[in-house]
Amino acid sequence: MSPVVLSLTGARKAFGADELFSDLSITLARGEHLCLLGPSGAGKSSLLRCLMGLEALDGGTLALADPAAGLGLVFQDFRLFPHLDALGNVTLALRAAQRLGAEEAEERARDALAQVGLEAFTHKKPGALSGGQQQRVAIARALALRPAVLLFDEPTSALDPERTAGLGAVLRGLTERGVALLTVTHDLAFAEHWADAVALLRDGQLTTPLPAARFFGPEAPAAVRAFLSPGAAPEEPSEP
């Protein structure tokens, strides 16, 4: 069994009197890809921001196996500097976040771009890249920091099926190298095909992560089946 790299226990987040989620726990193992599904407004993106420290949790404990490695986040609305080429975008972010010399930063940036299949596009500016290639630059930018866990917020929202498949292949390559992934998405097909495990965040509660085949199968919990096919799965009766 792969070692655990991230453990979130009993997390709670509220905005005033409105509780977004409570008693939420997640465990991620090295090289695991977990997808979180849920309706809009369920708190999925807020959860990612809390994990990154961009928002504060109102309760709970986050533990990382390697705090020095930390986490990386690829935003849904990522931005690249249009006047810099792919290598420059990654190198700039790396040098801003870590005190590296120019030579070491460039070497790590080239390695990150190679990991996402852009070694032949290092000197292309964003305007000369497709949307999918621009997204890979954003992934390389986060990957160059060498995080133990990468977080993705709706990574397929602007991609067509072909580019979505390309992204899935890139992410699978990362997990094969030991990077753990936590992806928030509305793309059911992406989660079913590319995730190792899938969980549902709804009404402030997170279901137990299940292997993708089981999550999307006929024996999934009633709450999951109701989300996937509204009206098709009645709630299971409670114990008397």
Describe these PLM feature segments.
Residues 52:
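Helix-to-loop junction immediately C-terminal to a conserved catalytic motif
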Residues 102-121:
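Conserved ABC ATPase "signature" region
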Residues 125-129, 133:
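Conserved ABC ATPase signature
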Residues 144-148:
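A short, proline-enriched helix->beta-strand linker immediately N-terminal to the Walker B motif
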Residues 150-153:
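Catalytic Walker B motif of ABC-type/P-loop ATPase nucleotide-binding domains
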Residues 185-186:
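H-loop/switch region of ABC-family ATPase nucleotide-binding domains
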Residues 191-193:
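A short, surface-exposed alpha-helical micro-motif characterized by mixed small hydrophobic
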